[in-house]
Curated annotation (Swiss-Prot):
It comes from the Eukaryota. One of its GO terms (molecular function) is transmembrane signaling receptor activity. Cooperates with LY96 to mediate the innate immune response to bacterial lipoproteins and other microbial cell wall components. Cooperates with TLR1 or TLR6 to mediate the innate immune response to bacterial lipoproteins or lipopeptides. Acts via MYD88 and TRAF6, leading to NF-kappa-B activation, cytokine secretion and the inflammatory response. May also promote apoptosis in response to lipoproteins. It is a single-pass type I membrane protein. InterPro entries: Cys-rich_flank_reg_C, Leu-rich_rpt, Leu-rich_rpt_typical-subtyp, LRR_dom_sf, TIR_dom, Toll-like_receptor, Toll_tir_struct_dom_sf. Ubiquitinated at Lys-755 by PPP1R11, leading to its degradation. Deubiquitinated by USP2. Ester-bound lipid substrates are bound through a crevice formed between the LRR 11 and LRR 12. There is a cross-link at residue 755 (Glycyl lysine isopeptide (Lys-Gly) (interchain with G-Cter in ubiquitin)). This is Toll-like receptor 2. LRR repeats lie at residues 54-77, 78-101, 102-125, 126-150, 151-175, 176-199, 200-223, 224-250, 251-278, 279-308, 309-337, 338-361, 362-388, 389-414, 415-437, 438-457, 458-478, 479-500, 501-524.
Amino acid sequence: MSRVLWTLWVLGAVTNLSKEEAPDQSSSLSCDPTGVCDGRSRSLNSMPSGLTAAVRSLDLSNNEITYIGNSDLRDCVNLKALRLESNGINTIEEESFLSLWSLEHLDLSYNLLSNLSSSWFRPLSSLKFLNLLGNPYKSLGETPLFSQLTNLRILKVGNIYSFTEIQDKDFAGLTFLEELEIDASNLQRYEPKSLKSIQNISYLALRMKQPVLLVEIFVDLSSSLKHLELRDTHLDTFHFSEASINETHTLVKKWTFRNVKVTDRSFTGVVRLLNYVSGVLEVEFEDCTLYGLGDFDIPDVDKIKNIGQIETLTVRRLHIPHFYSFYDMSSIYSLTEDVKRITVENSKVFLVPCLLSQHLKSLEYLDLSENLMVEEYLKNSACEDAWPSLQTLVLRQNHLASLERTGETLLTLKNLTNIDISKNSFHSMPETCQWPEKMKYLNLSSTRIHSVTGCIPKTLEILDVSNNNLNLFSLNLPQLKELYISRNKLMTLPDASLLPMLLVLKISRNAITTFSKEQLDSFHTLKTLEAGGNNFICSCEFLSFTQEQQALAKVLIDWPANYLCDSPSHVRGQQVQDVRLSVSECHRTALVSGMCCALFLLILLTEVLCHRFHGLWYMRMMWAWLQAKRKPRKAPSRDVCYDAFVSYSEHDSYWVENLLVQKLEHFNPPFKLCLHKRDFIPGKWIIDNIIDSIEKSRKTIFVLSENFVKSEWCKYELDFSHFRLFDENSDAAILILLEPIEKKAIPQRFCKLRKIMNTKTYLEWPTDDAQQEGFWLNLRTAIKS
């Protein structure tokens, strides 16, 4: 019994553990408010649960889903797109898509569906895109799969290995397709007219290794197909027989050969095929390989007429293993006389034989980009009578090194108007050059030039010198309408007077820091300006101009996203239209002027107040006080020279000199007085004289009167000594009041004097002669005390 319980417990624990480890399928989806749900690469092993009608798009690609049941998508009635590619789906139940009548995009590619059922697609009446590539089915089923898909526009079927058969019923019901892709790499059987049921196909991409069934397929499509692309085909054994084609009139306008292998002999078969069907205007070879030496054996070349209708020939990345043993292709020269556009790109072309150039009589456009052309061989290619109708020549990214020689070489091309020689390494530009006289367009971008000179033809209407090292553009080009000069080192816009007809200017990603309304207005005909990506200094003037000019947005095609501030530092990286600077930054001159005016007014006001309230007097008194503080508090007794220092007003000098001096200095014993007229040392600063005299006197006599308090002398010199004297709390001061003085008459700055007059006794000069003797007695007693 215990063993049974133990076993049940273990099973329960394992079950719970598996439930905990199993991911929540619905939570593995991320859906936005519009109903677009992303479940890519979430390691899902089954369809998510809980899908509702709110889901509009469901992407479950790159998971591990193997099975789709009838109920998994039942509620997704509004689903428009379902992507299930790159899973391991091997089973889809018959009614899995029954409710998806709104579905327009279905991708089931690269799964494990070995059998396809028409019941899957029957409800999908709105389907426009269906991808079934990469599934291991051998055929498209026993019954027509797509007969109900009347709105289908893009269909992709087949696989690399197992898809071996195309049946006549496979495409029944499809009348119009914009795009059909068939991977028939291992196709072994094709029932005649299997593709003929499709009445109109804009584009067919057919991947097949062997060309055995190519002509048969082409016959069925020739009257309904516009563009045929043949991929990954080995045409080395291809042979075309005219007897295999009954209908020569086709709708095919373009053939593309992509990653196709061709030999000299099979190339002849391709030429015969293109000749036998009429209407082909464009032939394209991309990433193809030519195993041969150019020894094309084309019998009855004169009978080949329809191939002459081809107007455009494009060759990109053509690989020729025996390239340096290649012939001159003279056998096909006559086939090229009516071609108007030729592109041979990245195919190691270093020479176009002169004879071939002369046969290209109708050629208007020639692109030899990314090849090995140099001036010497270009001269042979552009020989006399070569390319007589050529208007556009593209020699981008070759090995040209001299502008002067390149221009001279092309002088034979009388009708040449457009030249693209970008991505060549010219480095420098001569002062003068010769060019075809009808030149209108010149592309010199990415050629490492440092300056532009008179070598540029005056007849140009379009000039491209972008991505170089230019720091100045000062050419006079009176007919120029478009100038492309981005990714250089220009610091300002070109001079508009040199470009009077300019309509388009693209000058982005230079070193421009600003431009003004005046500069733009000088370009009278300018319609388009692209100047983003520069290091703009967002000054107040620049911001005002760009933000207030509403019409500027119509001219600046990259406004506002590419216009960012580089300085000031606090707005770096912000869009110009969003930056707002402070008043102090925008009106600095006015602010400084205002501050200077305010400072001047403050100084002026200070002077007025100082004069009005005797501020200078207070300052000078403070200075004197500080000077006095640094001296000893009291002079030594041996330095005392006077009994008293007399401080008085000049208006009271008569009383002092004729009465005070006579009564004191002629008394027995005499008193020695210090008078400023008599005892001050000439040449010595008056303040020092005053302070020294007070310090060398035992007493200081102040002769107070109305004249004293009004005297400039007292106001600005003598009262400095009063300040120090009273500050020492000494009794050395003797006050003589010559005449009654009201306290209101004493200025506020004589605060110490006012205080002493309130706290100390002073001597009053009597007007009565009988009382004067008592006055002198009291004075002499005060001096001796």
